[in-house]
Each structure stands twice: as C-alpha cells, then as structure tokens.
Design a protein with these regions (language model features):
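ATP-binding pocket architecture of kinase catalytic cores
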Residues: 23-131, 153
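Active-site acidic catalytic loop and adjacent metal/ATP-binding pocket
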Residues: 32-38, 163-210
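A short, local hydrophobic-aromatic micro-motif
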Residues: 73-76, 195, 213
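C-terminal subregions of glycosyltransferases and related glycan-biosynthesis enzymes
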Residues: 140-146, 159-161, 220, 242-255
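An alpha-helical support segment within catalytic cores of ATP-dependent transferases
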Residues: 3-15, 125-183, 189-190, 272
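Short amphipathic alpha-helical segments and helix-helix/interface helices
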Residues: 62-63, 120, 159, 163, ...
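Conserved N-terminal boundary motif of the eukaryotic protein kinase catalytic domain
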Residues: 16-24
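Active-site activation/catalytic loop segments of kinase-like enzymes and analogous catalytic loops
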Residues: 209-239, 251-269
C-alpha cells in the first residue's frame, strides 16, 4: 500500500481542496481505497489505487455496465506521476453489509437479491468483445493480481488456476459479469433499492455459472437457499443454470475465502 503522503499528494493533483482523506469504514482486504471530502462544498469522492492496466479496464467496464442501465460508479481513470487510480463521486447510501449488520430483515435481504438477479440477467446481454484483448479482462487474471497483492505470488497463482478450472465453459456461457457481488460491494440507497454495484476490479469476462456461483456463495453464508436463488433467476431470465456446478463453486469459494482470510491475518501478524 502507498504511504499516506503519496496518497494525499496524488488525490490533490485532481482535487486541490480535498481534505479528510482516509480509508472507508467498510473495506476489503486490499487497502487501496480512499475517500476524501471537498473543502469547498463537502462533496465526497472515492479513489482506488491500482495498476494502470486495471484502472483503464475498470473505467471501460463501468461504461459498458452503465450502458445497460446497471447502476455502477461513474469511474474516471487518472494518473499522478507513477500512480494510477480511478475516481468517482461517492454513492449516497450504505453497503448491504452495513444494512444487514443493523438488522435488515430476511425479506428485505431477499428483495435486494431479487434486484441483483435482474442486474445479473442484464449483464448476460453485454457484448464483452471490446475488452477481450485488455489486460485483466479475464476473471482469473483479476484474481491472480488481487490475491497476490493481499497474500503472495504462490497464493495468487494457486487461486488463479483454481478459477480457471471453475470458469471453464462453452463460448455461449461467457459474458461480462461482476464476479464479486457481495454485501460489501452492494450500495443500498435511501429507498431500500440498489444504488450501485462497486469494485470494478471484479467485472470481467466469466462463465455465467462461475459468476453466479461467486454471488451465490455469499447468499449461502447469509443462510439463503441457493436452489431458490437459481430457480428465481431462471424464471426472470429464461436462462438455464447448472445447479450442481454452482453448488460446487459456492462451496469451494467459501472454503477458499476462509483460507485466504487466515493467510491474510498471518501476514498482518508477521508485519507487526
């Protein structure tokens, strides 16, 4: 992670009056996301630091999803010296993670997932060819980069190869999907509906069953019934999913995330 001085300097090349630059309260494992306030009108912006290739890919996929009326941040790529980052106005609302922590009812959670299924169906219609030749256009490459950054090269390669295996399929099953639809990446607006899906790193070319399995893994952790989720999607989309494969992917994903969390904790302890 960059030093705070470097972060402040980079942010202020774009927003000179930026202040209160800090990490969000709810964040993932990468520790590369920051929020600032404008010293002029108090408006807030989100900055995510990454490689130039990842930032440019994220800017493009955000545009592709937005063109399908899928709510995502208006990502703009920016560079300051050797540092690259994406920036967008902070989305009003709270993460689904926060809402669940504050006692969101199971019925309301199911309502959010019903909206997610509609968005997932829209993703299946996106032409992914414009990003095919870009670096990090494939979901296993995204996994390799992010897991390596959080853990190490060995874990990055291990997870990348596992994703390659789970992500296999025929050409007609591939699409441009958000493969990280978790409660931390879903922003709920004041009306109780989805205001945005965030973390454009996770948007990549993927097999439909793999992407659905990644989303279903978290639903399973919330005590949801994956079969019901699959049946609902097939009803609203008219598409058939591979139930057995999705169950396998969800189970492997939940085991893998637990292992990665333990490895990350071990790394943090050794760095102290």
């Amino acid at each position: 992670m960059q030093k705070q001085f470097d972060i402040d300097t980079a942010v202020k090349t774009l927003h000179i009056g930026a202040c209160e630059i800090s990490m969000p309260k709810i964040r993932g494992a990468q520790n590369n996301v920051f929020i600032s306030k404008s010293g002029i009108d108090g408006s807030e912006y989100v900055y995510k630091f990454n490689s130039a290739e990842m930032v440019l890919k994220n800017e493009l996929v955000a545009q592709m999803l937005d063109a399908r009326n899928i709510p995502v941040p208006r990502v703009v790529a920016h560079s300051a010296g050797h540092q690259w980052f994406e920036v967008y106005p902070k989305i009003p609302g709270r993460t689904l993670y926060e809402c669940i922590g504050d006692g969101m009812t199971p019925d309301d959670i199911d309502g959010v997932y019903a909206d997610i299924l509609d968005l997932f169906a829209q993703m299946s219609k996106i032409d992914w060819r414009p990003i095919y030749k870009m670096q990090y256009s494939q979901t296993h490459d995204v996994v390799k980069a992010n897991v390596t950054g959080v853990n190490n090269k060995f874990m990055g390669k291990l997870y990348s190869e596992a994703v390659k295996l789970m992500n296999r399929g025929s050409n007609e099953t591939y699409g441009l999907y958000h493969c990280g639809i978790t409660p931390k990446n879903v922003i709920i607006g004041h009306d109780g509906h989805i205001a945005a899906l965030v973390d454009m790193d996770e948007v990549a070319i993927a097999n439909k069953n793999y992407a659905f399995g990644m989303m279903a893994a978290k639903y399973q952790q919330l005590r949801g019934n994956i079969n019901t989720l699959i049946d609902s999607y097939e009803f609203v989309s008219g598409q058939i999913l591979d139930k057995k494969r999705i169950h396998t992917i969800s189970n492997i994903t939940n085991f893998g995330k637990r292992l990665m969390w333990l490895m990350g904790r071990r790394k943090q302890i050794h760095q102290r």
